Amino acid sequence: MSEQQKYKVIKKFADFEIRDYEPCLIAEVSVDGSMNQAGSYGFRPLFNYISQNNISMTAPVIQIPVKNDQWKISFVMPSGSDISNLPISKNSDVEIKQIPQGFYACLKFSGNYSEAKLEKNLNLLRSALVRESIKEIGNENNWRSARFDPPFKPSFLKRNEIQIPVNWNN
C-alpha cells in the first residue's frame, strides 16, 4: 500500500470526518479539459517526474478545480521530503509546492470516479457541513477530490473522497 498524506482524525460524524492534515510538499500540474480528461492528462507528467527521479508513489492523487475546465492535479511527495532536496522536473509544467497544515471535512465514496458521482458527494458533504454549522474556507471551488487507488483496481474496491477546507476551532 502506498504511503498516504499524513493527518489526524479530529472528529467523526455519521457521514464525514474532520481531519487535521500536516504540511506537505506536492508536485503539481495545471491542466485544461473536462474533469476526467484533466485527471488523465495531469497524471502522466507527474508520474514521469516521480519515476525518473526514483520518488515513491503516494496517495491520494489530488484534483482541484480552478475554473471551468481548468484543474490542478497533484501528487503528495513522500514524508521526509524537503523542497531543497527534491529534483527539479525536466518538464517545466511540474511545480513543487509547499502546502500548509489545514483542517478538511472529508467524505469517502467508492466506485469509479465520475463527474456525476463527484457532484453528488460534493453536495452531500456541503449539506452535512450546513447541518453541523461548520464553515467552509474559500469560494465554491474550494474543494478537492482525492483518489487513492490505481485505475486497474476493481471499481467496487476503489476509495475516493471529497475534501473541503473548513474553519475548525473545537
Question: Locations of the language-model features?
Answer:
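A solvent-exposed interaction/effector surface
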Residues: M1-N170
